[in-house]
Regions:
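Conserved GNAT-fold acetyl-CoA-binding loop/helix
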Residues: 19, 23-45
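A short helix-loop-beta-strand connector motif used in the catalytic cores of GNAT acetyltransferases and
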Residues: 46-57, 84
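Conserved beta-strand in the GNAT
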Residues: 57, 63-72
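A short, internal acetyl-CoA/4′-phosphopantetheine-binding micro-motif in the GNAT/acyltransferase core
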Residues: 88-95
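Conserved acetyl-CoA-binding loop-helix of GNAT-fold acetyltransferases
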Residues: 96-109, 136
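Conserved GNAT acetyl-CoA-binding A-motif
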Residues: 112-122
Length: 169
């Protein structure tokens, strides 16, 4: 292994590697039972007619060593675009080569070319290794914020309520 890290935009041919990376993150957290996405979901929503996300892959000696899945975001406070990192994963054998940092550095540079000024992400509260990594490269915890989410039945209840016609007085 030469250790040379090459970063490039993911293609549909990387869908399986991206899915594998997501599964590896879930496995680290003991939550593989919660993953319901499929490789076909990655192909459809990442590389279809209206992609919902983009991805970068890192390669070492031609092998996928890591991946970063992200999508566009907008800050109404800052009045500028940025990106939200959904997943960042580096295969264990390629850790300590700077792969994760290189992926995020490339993402920051790409984001800046698009007029973006920030990267946001969330980290599982139990994943202290990832928290330390992000701190070391300058992506710091935003202490004043908490993440809220609506999934499954809660999401369906919101969507069902939104299906009702709006009445104006």
């Amino acid at each position: 292994m030469t250790g040379t890290v090459a970063i490039r935009t993911a293609t549909i041919g990387n869908a399986e590697a991206l899915h594998r990376a997501m599964l590896a993150i879930a496995e680290t957290m003991g939550e593989t039972h919660r993953v319901v996405s499929t490789i076909d979901d990655i192909r459809r929503y990442g590389f279809g007619d209206a992609p919902c996300f983009e991805a970068l892959v890192a390669e070492v000696d031609g092998a996928v060593a890591g991946a970063c899945v992200f999508f566009a975001s907008f800050s109404t406070y800052r009045g500028r675009p940025g990106v939200y990192v959904q997943d960042l994963h580096v295969e264990p054998r390629y850790r300590r080569l700077g792969v994760g940092a290189k992926l995020l550095q490339r993402l920051a540079a790409l984001t800046r070319t698009r007029g973006g000024i920030y990267i946001r992400l969330s980290v599982d509260a139990r994943n202290t290794a990832a928290q330390g990594f992000y701190d070391r490269i300058g992506i710091v915890h935003s202490a004043g914020e908490l993440i809220h989410a609506a999934y499954d039945e809660a999401f369906d209840a919101l969507a069902d309520a939104g299906d009702e016609p709006t009445v104006t007085a």
